Curated annotation (Swiss-Prot):
One of its GO terms (biological process) is proteolysis. SUPFAM superfamilies: RuvA domain 2-like (SSF47781). It comes from Roseiflexus sp. (strain RS-1). This is UPF0758 protein RoseRS_0767. InterPro entries: MPN, RadC_JAB, RuvA_2-like, UPF0758, UPF0758_CS, UPF0758_N. Zn(2+) binds at residues 178, 180, 191. Residues 107-229 form the MPN domain. It holds the Pfam family RadC. It comes from the Bacteria. Belongs to the UPF0758 family. Keywords: Hydrolase, Metal-binding, Metalloprotease, Protease, Zinc. A motif (JAMM motif) lies at residues 178-191. One of its GO terms (molecular function) is metal ion binding.
Amino acid sequence: MTEYHVRIRELPPTDKPRERLRSSGAAALADAELLAILLRVGIEGMNAIQLAQQLLVEFGGWNGLQRAGFEELAQRRGMGEAKTAQLKAALEIGRRLLLAGGDERFLIRSPTDAAQLMQIEMSHLDQEQLRAICLDTKNRVQKIQTVYIGSLHTSMVRIGEIFKEPIRLNSASIIVVHNHPSGDPTPSPEDVVVTRQIIEAGRLLDIDVLDHLVIGAGRFVSMRERGLGFGKP
């Protein structure tokens, strides 16, 4: 049987993504509808909503689209460079909005709060990065600083670099975060050693090290919760 595909312009007004956004707000739209608005048009035999749904399934949702390379997306049927550029720009706007939101959004109350702040970007990095979240006396984010790029070895990481920005900002505390490109967030023995060194340096500088998070693929480990590096050696 020949499949029958309805173009978006042939849908009832109440089913068109842009009209639904106007009448009900963006939060009411499904992921495929939001993506369809960016794509604008579909391809032969597939409207923009269906194309959007296919992309979301193929790449594993928004995180997968964020991780996908520009060329990988642009070569997909129905995409091309213009649509890929629009999509990548929209995803980057969302990432920057998350990182630059108001104080209330970025009040860190738990390891989960800190992980949610960092996971979107750091879970898809292809190199290890060590970052420090600088916090004020109310645990509000002051700045997120990239300290080091490369494998986390005690001989390579300069502990003093971690505290340069917290000292400048007069931070009360920091949360250290690094990623495992393998996707497995299990802390290594080197991670534990580095954590102890960072905590000791923080004590000397009167800057509390609240936690060290290891980010993996959709998962994270709080080394404080595991008692790794935060207890007695």
